């Protein structure tokens, strides 16, 4: 298959998937999730391959969804990352949460092909892995970062929820909350200290370290790798990973269509996505004046 958003190559027992939209910092478009899943399937069906390395072309690993295209454009289902047609006679301003869920859950499961792959997956994170890009990286079995690279989910501040929900399963409740209640980015050193990623090394040593671990894994028989991975993943399945992802995907759609989400969408249309992001992440109150009371009714008996 000819891929438009990534490159796929095999060298000995190692398959490499390279996200290949460097001019957009490998931002996710509508094609990329399915192409990731297709490349993972190619590797799983290739008897020569024992391990898969995922990386990005250019300066970034993945900057998340290509929201400049979606956030700055006015149109149907405002705020939706998916857009989509509107039936004749329907209100074009209406948001269909189940249509949104259908598309975003499909993307999430395509990212999760990295987690469910029968062959181990290693994310080589040399540059920013943010928003949806962090979702992709954290779906891999192992994540090795450059110390200088950053990872995080800034849309947790407004307009998003991490649909793969891997933060809590990697960090535990308190550290996951610390990251998602702030939307902060952390560098590779801090990510490794927190236990979010396996390790961080200087950028100049990243290729050698990834190759070292990949080659060590690749020496193991494929059936042994498959058994160990299925056993570990089963523990996470038993903890409710799939249900948490469904919940997170629903919340992601809601976040994009909340009063604050619509504020962000309007700001992106007015001043451009980059400026809207600067306002979101600048440290001041987010979406001033947009929020509604969380408790709109008085207390009983009050």
Regions found by a protein language model. Name each.
Residues 59-63, 130, 232-235:
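Short, active-site-adjacent cap segments at secondary-structure transitions
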Residues 112-225:
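Crotonase-fold acyl-CoA enzyme core
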Residues 31-35, 106, 113, 209, ...:
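Charged catalytic carboxylate motif
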Residues 56-113, 275:
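Glycine- (often His-adjacent) and acidic-residue-rich active-site loop
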Residues 1-57, 71:
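Conserved CoA-thioester-binding segment of acyl-CoA-metabolizing enzymes
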Residues 17, 21, 35-36, 54, ...:
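Terminal peptide-recognition signature
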Residues 22-25, 59, 148-150, 185:
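A short, glycine- and basic residue-enriched loop/turn
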Residues 1-12, 79, 187-188, 208, ...:
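C-terminal alpha-helix plus adjacent terminal tail
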């Amino acid at each position: 298959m000819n891929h438009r958003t990534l490159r796929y190559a095999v060298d000995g027992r190692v398959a490499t998937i390279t996200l290949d939209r460097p001019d957009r910092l490998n931002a996710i478009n509508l094609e990329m999730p399915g192409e990731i899943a297709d490349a993972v399937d190619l590797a799983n069906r290739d008897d020569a391959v024992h391990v898969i390395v995922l990386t990005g072309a250019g300066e970034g690993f993945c900057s998340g969804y290509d929201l400049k295209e979606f956030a700055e454009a006015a149109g149907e289902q405002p705020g939706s990352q998916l857009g989509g047609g509107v039936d004749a006679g329907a209100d074009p301003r209406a948001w269909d949460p189940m249509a949104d869920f259908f598309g975003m859950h499909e993307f999430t499961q395509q990212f999760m092909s990295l987690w469910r792959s029968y062959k181990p997956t290693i994310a080589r994170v040399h540059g920013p892995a943010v928003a949806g890009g962090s979702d992709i990286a954290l779906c891999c079995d192992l994540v090795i970062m450059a110390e200088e690279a950053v990872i995080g989910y800034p849309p947790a501040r407004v307009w998003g929820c991490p649909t793969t929900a891997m933060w809590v399963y990697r960090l535990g409740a308190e550290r996951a909350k610390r990251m998602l209640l702030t939307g902060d980015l952390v560098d590779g050193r801090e990510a490794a200290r927190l236990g979010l990623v396996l390790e961080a090394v200087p950028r100049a040593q990243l290729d050698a370290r990834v190759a070292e671990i990949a080659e060590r894994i690749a020496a193991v028989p494929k059936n042994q790798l498959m058994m160990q991975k299925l056993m570990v993943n089963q523990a996470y399945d038993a903890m409710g990973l799939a249900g948490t992802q469904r919940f997170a995907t629903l919340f992601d759609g809601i976040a994009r269509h909340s009063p604050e989400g619509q504020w962000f969408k309007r700001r992106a249309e007015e001043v451009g996505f980059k400026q809207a992001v600067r306002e979101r992440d600048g440290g001041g109150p987010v979406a001033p004046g947009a929020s509604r009371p969380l408790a709109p009714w008085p207390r009983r008996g009050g």
